[in-house]
Structure formats: structure tokens, C-alpha cells
A protein has these predicted regions:
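Amphipathic, interaction-prone secondary-structure segments
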Residues: 23-49, 132-159
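Intrinsically disordered, low-complexity regulatory segments enriched in Ser/Thr/Pro
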Residues: 43-67, 158-183
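Ampiphathic alpha-helical segments that act as solvent-exposed interaction surfaces
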Residues: 59-83, 173-205
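Short flexible/disordered coil segments
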Residues: 88, 147, 152, 156-157, ...
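Domain-length accessory/inserted modules outside core catalytic folds
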Residues: 104, 108-109, 137-138, 177-181, ...
Length: 205
């Protein structure tokens, strides 16, 4: 068993400690023959006390770890979207800010000009097609997505023009820390960004 698998199994043990019904309410998720199901990173996710499955495939790597961590720490509270929070404004985030920008924001910058044409597809895939970004959100466009049921990310995109290069900023829903520790939030944003890039690559082929 790999290190990731050990951590995933430990997190799932904590997640299911109070029973599947209590966990289903916290996630929230549905109980079914495959386990507890809910959307995660644009795929159908199924949890059992033994494993995490994304899109029907057993996930034993970093994404599986993030999902298991969410399951282990999610609170019964409701998601509060506003005010959106920058990663740098989260407590104790200073040592991780460089890595966050490198992994969650900068990878989208070279393809910022493609985002408007792919926006609907991205929102549909990541559960952002039912809610708009908060009124007054800056940028040329924004993407409000839900990589996990109670964690929202808002990507603010500035398109390149004659004076300024493109830029992308990723913000979190107001109480995201209620449902995930800091390192898990950084990883959530990273893997959401990777999924957005995958969607754009799929759409261009």
C-alpha cells in the first residue's frame, strides 16, 4: 500500500466514524450501491470506508487524498460564498503563497484568451452553471466553480490587451476553511486548475 493509499484509508476511517448517514449529510452526498456519491473535480465520486472512486476509477493518488480529506473534515455548516477570500488572506498561508500562485493561477495565464470560448463547458463540468459570481466581481470574466460540494472557487480572468498581459486570480468561498485545512484548499485549487486545462484541451481537439 502506497503512502497516499495509507493516508486516504486513514481519512476515510475518520470520515465514516459517525456512520454513512452522518457523512452523507456533511458532504452532502447520496447513499447508493457504490457508496456515498457526490460530484468532485468534474466527475462522479463514490466513497466507501475502503476507497475513493472518481469517474468509476479507483483514485489512489493526490486527488483521492484531497477528496478523502474533504470527507474527513467537512462540517455540517452550509457553504457561504461571500465575501470571497484570497489564498494570501487565509491564516498561516504565507509559506504556501508562491506554490499556490504557481500551481493554481499561473498555469491558466497562457491560455486566458481561450477561456471565454470554453467558459460554458468549464462551468457545466465543474458545477458552476447554476450560480453566478457575486455582483461586482472584477475582471474581464469570472468562473465560479464547485470542485467539491461545499467549496467554491472563483477564477477572475483579465484578458491580455495592448497595455497589460493576461492574469488570473483564484479566490475561495468565504468559509472554505470550515470544510478543508489550508494545504487541502491549495491542492483543491491546483487540481481544479488542472481540470480546467483538461477541459480546454478536450474542447480544442
Amino acid at each position: 500500500m502506497s503512502h497516499y493509499e495509507t493516508l486516504i484509508r486513514d481519512n476515510l476511517g475518520s470520515a465514516f466514524a459517525d456512520g454513512a448517514e452522518a457523512l452523507a449529510e456533511r458532504l452532502p452526498g447520496r447513499q447508493g450501491p457504490e457508496g456515498l456519491t457526490f460530484p468532485a473535480f468534474g466527475a462522479s465520486c463514490a466513497l466507501t470506508p475502503q476507497d475513493v472512486r472518481l469517474g468509476g476509477e479507483r483514485e489512489t493518488g493526490p486527488r483521492g487524498l484531497v477528496v478523502s480529506l474533504y470527507a474527513a473534515t467537512a462540517s455540517p455548516e452550509f457553504l457561504l460564498l461571500e465575501p470571497l477570500v484570497a489564498f494570501r488572506d487565509l491564516p498561516d498561508s504565507m509559506p504556501y503563497q508562491g506554490a499556490f500562485a504557481a500551481n493554481a493561477e499561473r498555469p491558466l495565464v497562457p491560455r486566458a484568451s481561450e477561456i471565454p470560448a470554453r467558459r460554458s463547458r468549464i462551468l457545466e463540468d465543474l458545477g458552476g452553471d447554476e450560480m453566478d459570481a457575486p455582483e461586482g466581481t472584477p475582471g474581464d470574466l469570472s468562473l465560479l466553480v464547485f470542485p467539491l460540494p461545499k467549496i467554491a472557487l472563483c477564477y477572475i480572468v483579465y484578458l491580455p490587451d495592448d497595455e497589460f498581459p493576461a492574469s488570473v486570480t483564484c479566490l475561495f468561498s468565504s468559509n472554505a476553511r470550515t470544510f478543508m485545512p489550508l494545504d487541502g484548499l491549495a491542492d483543491t485549487a491546483e487540481y481544479t486548475t488542472r481540470r480546467i486545462l483538461e477541459i480546454m484541451s478536450e474542447a480544442s481537439t
